[in-house]
Amino acid sequence: MKIADLMTLLDHHVPFRTAESWDNVGLLIGDEDVEVTGVLTALDCTLEVVNEAIEKGYNTIISHHPLIFKGVTSLKANGYGLIIRKLIQHDINLIAMHTNLDVNPHGVNMMLAKAMGLKNISIINNQQDVYYKVQTYIPKDNVGPFKDKLSENGLAQEGNYEYCFFESEGRGQFKPVGEANPTIGQIDKIEYVDEVKIEFMIDACQKSWAEQLIKQYHPYETPVFDFIEIKQTSLYGLGVMAEVDNQMTLEDFAANIKSKLNIPSVRFVGESNQKIKRIAIIGGSGIGYEYQAVQQGADVFVTGDIKHHDALDAKIHGVNLIDINHYSEYVMKEGLKTLLMNWFNTEKINIDVEASTINTDPFEYI
């Protein structure tokens, strides 16, 4: 399996297009044409993680947090530059799966909920997928070659199906005037043409490409085409809603999380003895969604990186919070390893996958 094949597999199961627009996911460092010798999953790509991959003989690291995020202005032999230089020197490929793994139904938030021992887990804050139905009109004799060109360039595909078009016949008319250079017809004379209306679906990201291809391969000098926007609720969403088997107090639930996740500290906002049943979870930094979670029926909102003033606002408004620290997302190391092994087994791919043993939490606790 080459890196390009691995990227295709990852994109199939955890589409990179579902990442937030501000995010930096995908192949950050590497060569798509090299063979994968082994995969190391990690929360962060630190120098220690790179050394671990080198020791194992693995040439691919898949990290949750992007190493290259805000931009790199120099590659010196220290700091982030040292990490990047070492990756390049040892021909190690670095792939980031950040918010696309956050919003995935099998992703970080699902992994956290399962690690906490919760049940009835479902995605919340579902994304809206945007598609376009494309319509254009073309002379009957040109239909086949035109569809072939669109299909060859990746359009009119639905899942595992290609060449997905709908056709309906009709009669078009036009009159070339002025300096027109018509493929069919004469200047100042109305022309009637047997035409076929061709329809097909595209993803939002294909819109400009579709327009370019239609203009390039349509026989008319000025082709007519429409893009009709269609929105559908996605399977992807930022956060999960889950339940405990039996009601417990907020304090007991916080203590239970600390034990289940094996993390050094947990903070909570709310009345210690308040009963908890439904839990909303957004790993990492999820503040901003706590009130929406309550409106959706959550008794407590679990996330990390909660600031003082956000906690105070929540306390004043009677919203229960539990801060499990950003590093709690480390559960994705084993979680992603399991997913990769399942995907590889299904495809009969024999590549070693290991979860990094390096603790990349920058904090020390007393």
From Swiss-Prot:
Homohexamer. The keyword Zinc applies. GO terms for molecular function: metal ion binding. Zn(2+) 2 binds at residues 65, 326, 329. Belongs to the GTP cyclohydrolase I type 2/NIF3 family. One of its GO terms (cellular component) is cytoplasm. This is GTP cyclohydrolase 1 type 2 homolog. Keywords: Metal-binding, Zinc. Zn(2+) 1 binds at residues 64, 102, 329. Pfam families: DUF34_NIF3.
